[in-house]
């Protein structure tokens, strides 16, 4: 795609520096929630009743990121409790929280908690931040191991749909590996080792201007929990006889997946964009305004350029 931008207040002596800085524009591959999805059924088989474990991220001495309006552990607890309250309204679902008090709990213990309850899925609730405070958007981390990769991708796609509805930028459904090829994130690794599908939900970045409006108040954190519950309800096709809500059709309208190998869409694309061109269209030294044109193409994934 092509993006034109104007850089104001540029003096003659700074034009070259401005051009150099512009060349460093970053490219980010992102998950397109409106992708053409073949209506495939949920790959994960379950019994008549579904068991869900919600894990409020961090706790105790592990406070999570401190870059937001409050400690991450406080935000995740509010979100998890709201998610729990919403999910328990549906029929044929048992919902558990790994903890409800502000306590330290190892990742292995969280996964073991889910295993002891024969959980169909463990959802770890989190908020994000970045070193340079310049990243934004929502993402879901899942296992690289099949069939958990496929299960996680189908759920993550549903979660991204909900985040898109809120107006958040979608960073995607992804895997991250250690140097030895194992899953990087402990809660995912420990859950997979116990045969429990899992996903880390990183709702937004608490330290970046685009995302901050989404996570300022306790009501904001509760809203995320309700959206999470809706994602889970749609993924499992839950229903509520009292209200007439029935999401069984949604569980048959998920992305098509393979249980044989890791889904390419969940693998981080580390290659450079195929085309990345920067052109100077105009430089008005009287007004101090420079107009640049950026052309970018990446055949491996959708791409957005930003400065």
What are these regions (language model features)?
Residues 61-65, 209-210:
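Short, solvent-exposed loop/turn elements at domain surfaces
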Residues 64-78:
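Glycine- and acidic-residue-enriched helix-capping/strand-helix junction motifs
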């Amino acid at each position: 795609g092509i993006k034109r931008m104007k850089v104001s207040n540029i003096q003659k002596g700074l034009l070259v520096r401005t051009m150099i800085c512009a060349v460093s524009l970053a490219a980010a591959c992102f998950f397109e929630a409106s992708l053409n999805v073949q209506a495939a059924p949920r790959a994960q088989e379950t019994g008549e009743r579904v068991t869900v474990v919600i894990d409020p991220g961090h706790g105790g001495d592990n406070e999570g990121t401190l870059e937001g309006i409050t400690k991450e552990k406080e935000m995740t607890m509010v979100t998890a409790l709201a998610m729990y309250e919403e999910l328990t309204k549906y029929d044929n679902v048992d919902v558990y929280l790994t903890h409800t008090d502000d306590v330290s709990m190892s990742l292995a213990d969280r996964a073991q908690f889910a295993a002891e309850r024969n959980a169909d899925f463990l959802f770890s609730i989190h908020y994000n931040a970045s070193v340079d405070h310049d990243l934004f958007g929502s993402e879901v981390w899942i296992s690289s191991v099949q069939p958990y990769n496929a299960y996680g991708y189908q759920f993550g796609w549903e979660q991204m749909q909900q985040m898109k509805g809120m107006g958040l930028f979608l960073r995607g459904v992804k895997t991250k590996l250690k140097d030895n090829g194992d899953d990087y994130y402990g809660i995912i690794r420990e859950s997979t080792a116990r045969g429990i599908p899992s996903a880390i939900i990183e709702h937004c970045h608490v330290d970046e201007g685009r995302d901050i409006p989404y996570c300022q108040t306790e009501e904001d954190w509760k809203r995320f929990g309700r959206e999470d519950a809706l994602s889970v309800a749609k993924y499992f096709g839950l229903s509520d006889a009292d209200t007439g809500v029935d999401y069984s059709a949604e569980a048959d309208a998920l992305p098509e997946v393979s249980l044989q190998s890791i889904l390419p869409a969940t693998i981080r694309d580390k290659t450079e964009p195929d085309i990345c061109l920067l052109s100077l269209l105009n430089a008005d030294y009287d007004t101090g305004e420079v107009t640049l044109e950026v052309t970018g193409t990446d055949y491996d994934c959708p791409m957005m350029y930003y400065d």
